[in-house]
Amino acid sequence: MNNMLGYLRDYKRESVLAPLFKMLEATFDLFVPLVMADIVNVGIAAHDLHYILVRCGILLLLAVIGLTCSLTAQYFSAKAAVGYSTSLRHALFAHIQSLSFSEMDTLGTSTLITRMTSDINQVQSGLNLFLRLFLRSPFVVIGAMVMAFTVNARAALIFVVAIPLLSVVVFGVMVITRPLYKTAQVRLDRVLGLTRENLTGVRVVRAFDKEQDEIDRFENANDLLTKMQLHVGHLSALMSPLTYVIINIAIVALLYVGSIEINVGGMASGDVIALVNYMNQILIELVKLANLIVQVSKALACAGRVQAVLDTKPGLDFPAELRSEVPADKAGDAVRFDHVSLTYAGAGAPSLSDISFTAKRGQTIGVIGGTGSGKSSLVNLIPRFYDATEGTVEILGRPAADYPREALRGKVNVVMQKAQLFGGTIRSNLLWGNKNATDAELWAALKTAQAAEFVQAKPLGLDEPVEQGGRNLSGGQKQRLTIARALVGKPDILILDDSASALDYATDAALRKALAALPGSLTVFIVSQRAASLQHADQILVLDDGRLVGLGTHDQLRQSCPVYEEIYESQFKKGDVQK
């Protein structure tokens, strides 16, 4: 938690001035009851209008000064809280970018979004309230009691009895409701997670006619949240009547003692008014203090969750520069797996077991296998999205772990299964591959990816807007643009992870032909469920339950690999493979 306080270092001045100005405001507030008592005891008693007007002017001046101090304190506290949350959000976002796929899988997207938004907002609100009240409320409670004793020590003894009783009620309710508020926050996170899941998968929900099921699921979670919030609300609502009962009893006692003191000449009627005002000030500040503790408790709980993400160490350590030289006997290697195994965190069984193969520069490597056979797991090791649990992965003759992050990702570009585009334009999306690429290079990549024709047909061409997630493009168009984006970077190794699934056979064949015709020694890994897409590959890796059960050309595998032959025959009979 101390690490998170470091983000306040740029706002030390504001963090000091905010509570100080609040204490100044409280100081002026403490003088108000005395001035009011003076008006009653002197001005009204003597029927001195001038005296009354002067004291009213003093009250107005105190109000203006107090308001100025309050606004100044609010400005500084808001500046510190907003600046702190902004710095924290930037740091958290930057830290998330440094996490590997493994940590992202463990934490979960919904969790990270909640930490970035509602949790940091809660921390901001708690800090803002803390800076304004953590000194003011105790100062007013103590100050009001001291001022009460200056008015009349005997009557002020009622404060000595009332304040502990008020504290027991206020803080007792707080102690009871604090863990319940945490439970309510957990249930709120659940509702937010369900909402995000539903909105993300809204098309699937519609496709399977599951709207009512989703409504029922949401209502169940929302009902649990509502019940908890109502329960907490009912308990918190007890605070107001109980405290006002104590205050009213104390006020009655003050009036009784005050009347006796007035009769014997021990105090004036204005002093009773001052004591009642001090009692009300104490009540208000105790309620504020209890609310502050509840809000700060929520903020600390949220801060703890944010800190847990910040404490998550990136699982991959990238060197600052290349660590090794390429041996002469490996100069022609593009990718080499040497007895590689992979087990995901929390998984009981390995996803890959004892995989060994070598892909030469310029080769096209096909990867095929049934669902869950480990195809994506295998290609995700090449750009080092994950580290192998056992064995060694070598890229262009060097261990993958010897490359700096930028160097490795510059040499290996991946087109994921899900075609992900970002809001902007076609040009801005393509420039992710190489921010310095010229228009000629962009069009060349589009042509290779079989996307030039439909981009040229757009009214604005490269500057055609792309909505968030590419909502205004078809599945095939998005896939071709993501392939073009990868090609813009001119990588040494290109991985197509089932990223042509939305393309028809003709377009798929044209894409493979265009990739083969590219100059240089581009090595292409094609992950596909279609045997037809891989039959012209230089090598085909056949995976089954995480194991490499076949390695060779299409013709070789048909003779030697039963798994490949089964896949081929099943698709051929369905007309999914062309001879």
Where do the protein language model's features map onto the residues?
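Membrane-integrated ABC transporters
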Residues: 1-31, 36, 44-60, 65, ...
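An intracellular "coupling" helix at the cytosolic face of ABC transporter transmembrane type-1 domains
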Residues: 10-13, 98-102, 118-127, 131, ...
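ABC-type nucleotide-binding domain
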Residues: 327-579
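Hydrophobic/aromatic residues in alpha-helical transmembrane segments
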Residues: 32, 36, 73, 77, ...
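Transmembrane helices of ABC transporter permease
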Residues: 10, 14-27, 38, 59-62, ...
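Short intracellular "coupling" helices and adjacent cytoplasmic loop segments at the cytosolic face
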Residues: 46-47, 82, 90-114, 118-120, ...
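Helix-loop-helix
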Residues: 48-54, 147-161, 231-305, 309-310
